[in-house]
Swiss-Prot record:
InterPro entries: CAP_dom (IPR014044), CAP_sf (IPR035940), CRISP-related (IPR001283). It comes from Conus textile (Cloth-of-gold cone). Residues 22-24 form a propeptide. GO terms for biological process: proteolysis. Keywords: Cleavage on pair of basic residues, Disulfide bond, Hydrolase, Protease, Secreted, Signal. This is Cysteine-rich venom protein. Residues 62-183 form the SCP domain. Its EC number is 3.4.-.-. One of its GO terms (molecular function) is peptidase activity.
Length: 300
């Protein structure tokens, strides 16, 4: 029989284990399931103070980005950006880490498939958020389309044609200020847009707006379209709709439309002639053989 002291010790040890377990899961499970190292699972620095953005500042940051994008006179597919609170929440969390650097790709958003980009700035002076946005944009002086140049990554992210959503956050850490913007989608390429006349790939959704220098520019306005396309769907910037494939349908390609038999004949042959089932890891095979791969029930 355990003594009272042993019992208390056992309970204490159990409590420590349980608390430790909870600590590892202190963030929302949707982020933890992406990666336990997700930005939303980090602990804020003790000296970090959140500096909430006003709606006016959010609007100014968004408007400034769209003006910068409208300044690009040879982009055929430049999307208009809109504000996204999901991205802003993660950006704010990273700002609370007080680090002049990026969060190593741990900023993904479960509701937005694909990569999320990020721009970060730091100042111990009187730099404002709009000043940080302009500082990133000033990298254009070293930008050359199709040629990667160090020191232009912030500008490239600002004018990545496929970046349709932005969310930002800021913090104060002692005498230092940190500014963070997250973008969906992100890019690291040296060709951030397709060359051509502005809006030439989106004539049905084209909107003319004034750029940062007061000149008129054009952006593909799909802000009323779906947030993203899932399950391999392709976003059509002319119609502002997802083009789904295989068994997937609906506005964002998340509705499953199961067939009575697999689309690919090879998936319906006797077992000995079937394609190897481990091929189901590939997206095109999942679309061709949804029953064989277990995405749809076998009606037989």
């Amino acid at each position: 029989m355990l003594s009272t002291m042993q019992t208390v010790g056992a309970v204490l040890m159990l409590s420590i284990v349980l608390v430790a377990g909870r600590k590892r899961h202190h963030c929302d499970s949707k982020y933890y399931e992406l990666t336990p190292a997700h930005t939303m699972c980090l602990t804020d620095k003790p000296n970090a103070v959140a500096v909430p953005l006003t709606q006016e500042t959010e609007h100014e940051i968004l408007e400034m980005h769209n003006k910068i994008r409208a300044d690009v006179t040879d982009a055929a597919n430049m999307l208009k950006m809109e504000w996204d609170e999901r991205l802003a929440t993660v950006a704010q969390k990273w700002a609370m880490q007080c680090i002049l650097g990026h969060d190593s790709g741990r900023r993904g958003e479960p509701d937005l498939p694909g990569s999320v980009g990020q721009n970060v700035a730091w100042s111990s002076g009187d730099l404002t958020f709009l000043g940080a946005v302009q500082m990133w944009a000033d990298e254009i002086v070293d930008f050359q389309y199709g040629v990667w140049t160090d020191g232009t990554g912030h500008y490239i992210q600002q004018v990545f044609a496929g970046a349709s959503r932005i969310g930002c956050g800021q913090s104060a850490c002692g005498n230092n200020k940190y500014f963070v913007c997250n973008y969906y989608k992100g890019t690291m390429g040296d060709e951030p847009y397709q060359l051509g006349r502005p809006c030439s790939q989106c004539r049905s959704s084209c909107q003319h707006i004034r750029g940062s220098q007061g000149r008129w520019g054009s952006l593909c306005d799909c802000t009323n379209g779906p947030d993203a396309c899932f399950n391999g769907g392709i976003f059509n910037i002319n119609t502002c709709q997802c083009e789904c494939s295989g068994i997937w349908g609906g506005a964002d390609c998340q509705e499953k439309h199961c067939p009575n038999e697999d689309f690919d004949d090879m998936c319906r042959y006797p077992d000995a002639l079937r394609r190897p089932q481990h091929w189901c890891q590939y997206d095109n095979f999942q679309s061709d053989c949804p029953i064989l791969c277990g995405y749809c029930p076998n009606p037989n």
